[in-house]
Structure formats: C-alpha cells, structure tokens
Amino acid sequence: MAVCPSFRPERGISYKRYILGLLLRRTTGLVQISDIYSTISTTSAMGSHTTVSPQPHVPSSGVWCPAVTFFHHDTDSLDLASQSKYFAYLSKTGLAGLVILGTNSEAFLLTREERSQLISTARAAVGPDFPLMAGVGAHSTKQTLELAQDAAAAGANYLLVLPPAYFGKATNMNVVKRFFSEVAAKSPLPVVVYNFPGVCNGVDMDSETIAAIARDPASTHANGRSNVVGVKLTCGSVGKITRLAASFAPEDFATFGGQSDFLIGGLAAGSAGCIAAFANVFPKVTARIYALYQKGQIEEAMELQRKAALAESAIKSGIASTKHAVACYSAQLAGIQGAAGNLAPRHPYEEVGEGAKIVIRQVMAEVAEIEKSL
C-alpha cells in the first residue's frame, strides 16, 4: 500500500493509527479514539513509544493542574528535561489530572510542533494511566480540529477548548454554539468547554449557552453520549456552577472552577473540583483541601482553604508571578536545578520585578511549610 503523502510522522501519530482514523472518518464522520482501543500505542514527537490507558468519558473529579512551561531562553526552545521532571512530580501529588497547554502554559506562544512535544513529553513522564487534558484553543474551527488531532496522537485523554474570540464583537453566542457544535462533532476526544473572558476579548458564555452546547444533538457521539463532557469556569461564577450542577448529572458533565480560592464554595454548589494555576505551586495543599471536603472534614478544609487563598493572592497578577512561585517551591521539590532561569515567560513577556518576588515569598511562606509536611 502506498504511503499517504500527507502523513507526517514528526507530529507524533503512527501510520497505523492515521489510516484507522481516515477509515473511521469515512464511515462514521467521527473518530472517538477512546471507543476504539482499550489501550493505544502511540509514537511521540520525540520518537519514543507509550501506551495510553482508557479514561472515563467524563474527566475525574478533583484538582487538575494547568502546568506551566519551561524554556531554554538562550535558544528560545522548550526545556523538555525539566518539563518531564515537573510533569512526573505533579502526577504524584494527589492531583486528579494535568492540563497541558492551558493558559498558564503560554500555549498561544508555542508552535504547533511544540504543542505536540509538550503533550507527548507529559504522557511519557506520567505513564499511560494518569489523565491528561490538552488545550487546543485557536482562532478557527479548522485550526482547533487540527490541534485536537495532534493532541490525540500525542497521548491526551480530553480537550480543553476556548471559544474563538479574536474578532470579539463578531463572536456572539450563535457563533460560539456553532463553533462548539462543529468541534465536538468531529473531535477525536471528549471536549471540555473553557470559559475565560479575560483572554477571549470579553466573550463570556452564560450557563444557558454552555448547557445548550452540551445538549446539542450534533455533539452526540455514536454511543449516545455527548462529546461535550465538562466546562472550566475561569469567569469565577459560582452561580454558573450551581445552575450547571442542577442541569446535569455528575457522571455526564463535570463543572470545574477556574481558580482554587473558591474551591470549597464551588464544591458546595456542586462542582467537580477545580482546574487551578495555584496547583502548580502547592499541588499537595490544593488536593488536600478537596480531599478533606470530600471526607466531610469541612472545618479543617475551610481552615486550609483560607490560608491557601491568602497565599494565592500573591500570584493573581498573572503567569509570570505563578512561574516565579513555581521556581521557588514546587520546582525545587521536583528536583529541578536552576529552575528560575527557565521559568521566565517566553519572549516578549517579562519576569516579575524584585519587589513582587519578595512579596511572593513572604505571602506564601506559611503554606510552603504545610506543602512540605504533606
């Protein structure tokens, strides 16, 4: 059989898997890879082989961490050795899963090849069983679906999808619904909607729109289940969590808060947990809050939540402050040497100033000691 000229092994997909995907698209119009194999052998962008174990259709409840990215700034390239250590460390801290290529990964500053490399590096680092969600935000349906195929090939289990919002005023709710309908219908993996007005020109999906996206018949897979399986609400609305929890059973749809400082408030309203940047810095503490609440130890959970919320205030200014805090704390616990130099934001963005660095260390000192004790 002649090799398809469009097949590109450097993007991390085996030829056998590529051909299977083409056949499935022709016969069903969909590729739901988790329904094809009980396990999947993939070839990463780095040439190594790994196996991806099946995951539940809906992402597991708990704390997910949108991992930050390490760079060699002298060559403006990914520091995959440090990245691998970091992913491996996070996977052993009690987190429910990792988000690769979330906002905090600086995904929009990465090339398509670098995105695939990060996912395949994560899969190799955490093994076949640990859940990975991949951000595939882009400006068009076609771009998003291309990134979705790359993510599936590199070993992701779920997709985290922002609405296309470069043309903010033109991105009304009809456009948003159409976009998610098309993406969900053609996606190789289950889709988690990502609502973050701060990076989407103010585009803010209400709970009714999110529910309509999940219930759209076009999003329903051949197995009868919606391919839209959850939402991350970085808008910070506990009201949306409450309404969505009232609208969907947890086994059908997972509603995640987008920060950890309202984790308990979200859980009380029916959330599945959170996908939170703070978990980069203190993953054990954040996972501990969730675990205490689930065990019914509410007062202890609240006490730790309050301390964590105060510590989190020091990194609310953005990615640069979060990455500096990672360099101070979790990167050291992960055994990464000289992390500070490789955790500056990618150019043209700047590190936080010396004053902010002092504040971060002061405000986070107490929670840092708790993290070490866990």
Could you tell me what each predicted segment is?
Residues F7, Y15-Y18, Y37:
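Aromatic (phenylalanine/tyrosine) cluster motif
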Residues L20-L24, L30:
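Leucine-biased recognition of intrinsically disordered, low-complexity hydrophobic segments
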Residues H49, P54-C65, T69-G202:
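Active-site beta->alpha loop and helix N-cap motifs at the rims of alpha/beta catalytic domains
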Residues A124-F130, A154-G155, S187-L189, D216-S226, ...:
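Short helix-capping segments at alpha-helix termini
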Residues P197-K307, I315:
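Catalytic alpha/beta core domains of metabolic enzymes, predominantly
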Residues I264-L374:
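Structured C-terminal cap/extension of enzyme domains
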